[in-house]
Structures are given as structure tokens and as C-alpha cells.
Amino acid sequence: MQKLNKNVYDHYTQYPEKILQFGEGNFLRGFIDWQIDQLNQHTDFNGSVAVVQPRGSEKIKRLNEQDGLYTLFLQGMKDGEAVNEHMIINSISRGIDLFSDYEAYKELASSERLRFIISNTTEAGIVCDEKDRLEDRPQKTFPGKLTAFLYFRYQAFKGDQTKGCVLIPCELIENNGEKLRETVLHYAHLWKLEEGFTQWIHEANTFCNSLVDRIVPGFPVDSIDEITADLGYQDDLIVVGEQYYLWVIEGPDWIGKELPFAAAGLHTKIVSDLTPYRTKKVRILNGAHTAMTPVALLYGLKTVRDAVEHPEVGRFIRELIDDEILPVLKMEGLSQYADDVLNRFKNPYIKHYLESIALNAISKFKTRNLPTLKEYAEQKGQLPERLVFSFSALLYFYHDNETLQDDPAVLQFFKEVWCQEDGDMLRIASRVLGEQRLWGADLNEIPKLTDRVAVYLNHIHELGMQRALEQYCIQGGEVR
């Protein structure tokens, strides 16, 4: 069977490269690149995306073999009806492998048409590595790679103020645009780049905070043979996502003219303050995802839908949202939003594997759940027991688990703690909670948290997750 490429797709169009995208994963292709495809179809945007993979090169190779084309399935409720549709996305021009073709990356920096830079490198992506150097090919971190790219552009156009870029990071961290700009400026200082470059970053470039919302499980592993037979071509880059989506960009109004989302009928907003959008989405949807994942995986479940429809795990998740997340937010319309989120989790078309949510789970908990835990404890004078139970499950999940995908330093830390403390759950809890590099603070200072985590670690270890959760639910969190 022939593989999808421009020879198979009769409507293939080559657009000018206006966007550099860091990340080639399922989410960006099922969310951002789909929207760019919509802009090309319904407006005069006339632009494509050049993709850089932050790590490795295998998917870049597959992208180029398919001429940037891939099939997107959108499944779920649309305008009140269940809709399962698919389309070929024609917005990616090429993938650039930084490890084998760095010169192509440098060359793109001098493109007259390039205007936008978009990224999604997970919550752990916007960081600085003091060992990165401008001379590296490439740098280790995403911001290091980006700083080098912007410096190449600054040099190519001799500091021309009209050749700056609009940068829209999609990483789920607070003030992601501001954090990215700060990290770029840190690299500029670290590398002792001239003051003119720093001034150009400030004056010629626009860094936008943004918030993304769409569940994109990715490649349909379980049904790929049936799908391939129906499509009539082989596609190694199929993406499955839900119908619902929302993109909120905090930035000046003129961005909506350069990226004409409204004219394309897209549900993307340009706003002056995305804080309420972000807080609601990150705390409830992403927070529920991260809280359920270690509990459900240790229980033996595989998908988000399995978890929310399970009698005990589903009840645990619902009560965690209603009794611990919503009360600290103090915003209108939260109950309806929470109901909508749980209905999205139950989407019968979507198989969202919990293992995919477990990627970089420690940094995700810090961003999505730790603020709720702290605020609940401060406001109520007691601990949010379900969230603490989930936190304990997360720490136990990092015990002797070879399937974990996280920063090597994080994995090494947990390996050492679990090995050195030899099952002493109180000492394990104390060491992990005290590791400020993970949490940005010493969590042992939260009253009673260390002891409570140790209690739950003991129960999960001795009873297994099924019995531990059963006892927890029966006794309302008063397990001793």
C-alpha cells in the first residue's frame, strides 16, 4: 500500500514558510497545525510550518517522507451532535533535523517571510542549561536552540527592527511567554552577546502568553489496521483528537490580523489577560488528568475513560474535583466546566492513554496540582486528602518503574531515595518533599503533609492500590 505523500494527495499545496515550530508531537499537529491548515483554507494567510524536533530525529524523518502530510481524526461532540471526521493536514512544509542539518536551521533564520515561532516542549521544556553554548550544534535545551536562532536572525538582518518574530509558546506553565523571554535573555547574558541583541529581543519581538485546550491522544494504536484499510494509504503520523478546542493568546489586537482566526471561524481568542482561562483549565482539566494518572495506572487501568467510568476511581476523581479543586478557585461557572471536562474524558471515540499523561509527571504535578494543594491547606487549615493520596501515589509510581519518562536527573533522584531509605516511608516522604529542585519549596513545611504522605505510601505499598483506594473511599480519607 502506498504511503501518504504529495503524490497521493491531489490537493497538496506548498505554502511560504511563515512559522517555525519547536515540537512535532501529537498535540501540536492535532491542534496548532490543524488551525494553520484552516487559516490556509479559509483566509489569505498563505503560510506553512517548518518543524524542529527538540529531541532526536525519527519523527522528522517520517514527516519528510510524507512531505509533511498526515491524517487528523476529530471525534466527539460538535454542535450538539456526535461527529467522527478526518482530513489530511497540509500545513507542514518540512522537518529540520538539528543534529544532521543544522545549516538548514541557520538558513531559516534569515528568511524574509518567517514571522511566528510556536513551541510545545512540555512543562519541563522552558529551562536554562548553563552548559549550553552558542557554538553548540545544537544546544541541549529548547530556549538555548531558540536563542541561537534569534541571534542568527539578528545578525542576518543587522538588527532590523522589522524582522522580529511573534513567539507563542504552548507549554502549560504560568506566563509561558514571559518565562520564555526571560530565559532567552538569560542565555544572551550567559553567552555575552552584544547589548544590541538584547535590545532587539525587547523591541522587535513579541512574546505572548498562551493557553491551549484540546485532548489529543495521538496515534490510534489499537485500530490502525482498520483505519489504514479504510483510508487506502499508509500514514505513520495519524493523529486522533477531540472536537473541542480552545486557544487563548494574551497579546496585542494586531496579532488577530496577522493570524486571522476569527475570519476562519476558529475558536481562538486574542485577549489582554488569560489568567482566568488558564487557572480554570490547568487546575481542573490538567489537574484532574495528573491527579488520576498514578492512581489509575497503579490500579491497573489504561485510559482516561477507563478511570472516570470506574466505580471507585471515577468517584475518587469526581470528589477530588468537586471537594478540593473547585472550592479554592472561587470563580463563576466552575461546576458546569467541571461537568463538561468529565464528559470530554468519557468521549467514546477517544482512547487517551494514561501512560502518555505520565510523561514528566513530577513537573506536571508541580504546575497543575501543587498550587491547589497549598491553597487548600492555607484556606481550610487542613489537607486536601484526595490530592494528598494522589500525590503519594505519584511518588510510589516513581518507585522501581522502568517505563517512566522523565528528566534523567529526576529519575536518578527517585532511584537513590527509594534505594537508600530501604522502605522507610517517613524518611522517603521527608526527602522527596524536601527536594526543592522538584517543587520550588520545601513541602515538609506544609503542616502534617509529610506524615500523611508516609501513611498513604505505606498503605499503597502494603495493600496495593485497589485495596488502599477501597479503604480510603470507605473511610473517607481517614485511613491510618
From Swiss-Prot:
Q: Which residues bind NAD(+)?
A: I19, L20, Q21, F22, G23, E24, G25, N26, F27, L28, R29, G30
Fetch the Pfam families from UniProt.
Mannitol_dh (PF01232), Mannitol_dh_C (PF08125)
Instruction: Give the induction text.
Output: Induced by galacturonate, repressed by glucose.
One GO term under biological process is: mannitol catabolic process
What Gene3D superfamilies does the record point to?
N-(1-d-carboxylethyl)-l-norvaline Dehydrogenase, domain 2, NAD(P)-binding Rossmann-like Domain
The protein's annotated pathway:
Carbohydrate metabolism; pentose and glucuronate interconversion
> What keywords appear on the UniProt entry?
NAD, Oxidoreductase
Which molecular function GO terms apply here? mannitol-1-phosphate 5-dehydrogenase activity; tagaturonate reductase activity
- CC terms in the record's Gene Ontology section: cytosol
EC number(s) from the headed UniProt entry: 1.1.1.58
What's the catalysed reaction?
D-altronate + NAD(+) = keto-D-tagaturonate + NADH + H(+)
Q: Does the keyword Oxidoreductase apply?
A: yes
Q: Does the keyword Cell cycle apply?
A: no
Which NCBIfam families does this one have? PRK03643.1
> Known HAMAP family for this protein?
Altron_oxidoreduct
Comment field (misc): Member of the exu locus which is required for galacturonate utilization.
Q: Which family does it belong to?
A: Belongs to the mannitol dehydrogenase family. UxaB subfamily.
Recorded hits in PANTHER family, A to Z, give:
ALTRONATE OXIDOREDUCTASE-RELATED, MANNITOL-1-PHOSPHATE 5-DEHYDROGENASE
Its name, as the record gives it, is Altronate oxidoreductase
What is the source species?
Answer: Bacillus subtilis (strain 168)
Q: What is the lineage of its organism?
A: Bacteria, Bacillati, Bacillota, Bacilli, Bacillales
